Structure formats: structure tokens, C-alpha cells
């Protein structure tokens, strides 16, 4: 009798989870259907170059920095799109991270220009040329595929970590600093991207309109703490050589995403 009583809430919970999962899958199909239209409509305004830079840095250290990868007008469009966002999803894990995030699915409505840039042929070709093999954007249900990272309160940071690879192929993080400044002084913020390489700590320059490409599963990295009257807004994107995944990796990804996007990540 007791076991039958306990089965009722368990079954109810399972049905509720399945319903949320199906609803989320439908939403992702609708967003995917919109992506082509967004890329065409906002891609015209971005007016990205047809040709790639003639000289590209070497990727042997699994991280490169490309200054001024975007025309000024295109960069300003992305920056303004990021700054008109609504509230960020704040996360705080003692001794590891603190900050705000805007997830991929929300960018389709509040910053479609950013989605168009992420899906652009120019960015895909540029990243492929830098890395040395073809890459593609990661799937829409991965909330970290394309997101905005807001360091907007004192002490916002993320401690030393690797970026876990949830896919069968190689996985890369691509960053574009959209805002990085002290709000009252003419200088960059105190939040700095630092990597550990050959037992040395190296600060990676992140002024606005810089493209940073790195293989996060191989590059140990952190972002130092923001101070008062500072703002740092990063466009964070991910690409991979093979976007397929396994059930186990997909489950791990969803639990990881809880740290950034809350419990709703469980049914992405």
C-alpha cells in the first residue's frame, strides 16, 4: 500500500518533467526555424567581410588572440544589442564563480544581431581557419552555445577551470569582449582572463573588439575579480568539429548548465 502511495507523486513528477521536456523541444525547433531568417535579416546590417584576414596566428598553443576582427560598425551593432538586454540570470558558487548570464534561447528575441553573428559564415570560416579544421556552431539546446557573460557587480569572477567537452569532436570557446571598462576612468576593468601555460600564468588581452579562440578542455583558465565601478560584457560562443553527443554527456551538460541558467537547464 505504501509503495503504491509513493508511486503517485513519482509518476506525477515524471509526467511533469516529460511535458516540460517536450515543450522545450518544440521551442527549440521553432527557434531553429527562425535562425536562417535572423541570419539573413541582421547579417545585412552587420555587413561582415567576405575575405578572411591574410595572416592568422598559430594555434599550436590551443589559444589565439585576434585584435579588431570586426569592422567598427559591426562591432557597435553587437555591443548595442548586448546592452539592451533584460535582467541577467545571476549565479554564485562560493570560491568558484559569480556573475550574470543571458542564455542562447533568449538572445533570439532580445539580441537577434548576436545570433546572426554566431551563425554567420564569416565567423565559422574564420574559426575553422584559425583552428585548422572545419568547425560548426554547437546545438541550440546547449545554452552555452552563444551567451552573454555579464561581470557587472564587484567580485564577479570565475576561478580556475577547464571547459568540459560534451561532444564527440573537439570543442572550442570563442570570446568577443563587447564592453570592458572602468565606468569613471579611461582604462580596462580589473577582470582579466588568465591562463596557465607551462607552469606560468599568462594574462590574455581582452580589450573590446578582440577575438579569443581557445580549446577550453586543454587550456586551464580563470577570470579575476571585478572591482567597483567596472563593467565587462563578453560574448561567449562555442564551436565543435562534431556536434554529436551521448546520453551521458548530454545529462552532464544539463547539470553543468544549472550553475549558469538555473533548474530549467534540466529539460534542455
Describe every region a protein language model picked out.
Residues 5-8, 110-123, 138-139, 175-186, ...:
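Short N-terminal helix-initiation segments at or just after the protein's N-terminus
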Residues 1-59, 258-268:
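Fe(II)/2-oxoglutarate
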Residues 68-69, 217, 237:
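Short, well-ordered beta-to-alpha junction loops that form the rim of enzyme active sites
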Residues 128-218, 230-233, 241-249:
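Catalytic core of non-heme Fe(II) oxygenases with the double-stranded beta-helix
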Residues 221-222:
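Short glycine-rich, flexible loops that bind phosphorylated cofactors or substrates
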Residues 43-131, 225-268:
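Non-heme Fe(II)/2-oxoglutarate
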Amino acid at each position: 500500500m505504501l509503495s503504491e502511495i509513493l508511486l503517485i507523486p513519482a509518476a506525477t513528477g515524471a509526467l511533469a518533467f516529460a511535458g516540460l521536456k517536450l515543450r522545450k523541444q518544440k521551442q527549440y525547433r521553432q527557434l531553429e526555424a527562425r535562425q536562417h531568417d535572423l541570419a539573413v535579416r541582421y547579417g545585412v546590417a552587420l555587413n561582415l567581410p567576405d575575405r578572411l584576414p591574410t595572416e592568422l596566428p598559430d594555434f599550436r598553443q590551443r589559444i589565439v588572440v585576434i585584435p579588431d576582427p570586426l569592422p567598427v560598425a559591426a562591432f557597435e551593432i553587437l555591443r548595442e544589442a548586448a546592452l539592451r538586454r533584460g535582467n541577467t540570470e545571476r549565479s554564485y558558487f562560493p570560491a568558484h564563480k559569480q556573475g550574470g548570464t543571458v542564455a542562447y534561447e533568449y538572445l533570439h528575441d532580445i539580441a537577434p544581431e548576436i545570433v546572426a553573428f554566431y551563425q554567420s559564415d564569416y565567423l565559422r570560416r574564420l574559426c575553422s581557419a584559425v583552428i585548422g579544421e572545419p568547425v560548426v556552431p554547437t546545438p541550440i539546446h546547449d545554452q552555452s552555445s552563444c551567451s552573454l557573460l555579464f561581470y557587472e557587480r564587484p567580485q564577479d569572477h570565475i576561478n580556475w577551470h577547464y571547459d568540459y567537452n560534451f561532444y564527440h569532436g573537439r570543442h572550442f570557446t570563442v570570446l568577443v569582449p563587447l564592453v570592458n571598462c572602468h565606468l569613471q576612468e579611461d582604462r580596462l576593468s580589473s577582470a582579466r582572463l588568465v591562463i596557465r601555460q607551462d607552469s606560468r600564468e599568462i594574462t590574455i588581452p581582452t580589450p573590446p573588439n578582440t577575438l579569443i579562440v581557445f580549446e577550453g578542455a586543454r587550456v586551464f583558465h580563470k577570470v579575476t575579480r571585478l572591482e567597483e565601478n567596472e563593467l565587462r560584457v563578453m560574448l561567449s560562443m562555442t564551436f565543435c568539429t562534431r556536434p554529436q553527443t551521448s546520453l551521458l554527456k548530454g545529462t552532464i551538460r544539463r547539470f553543468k548548465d544549472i550553475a549558469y541558467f538555473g533548474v530549467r537547464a534540466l529539460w534542455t
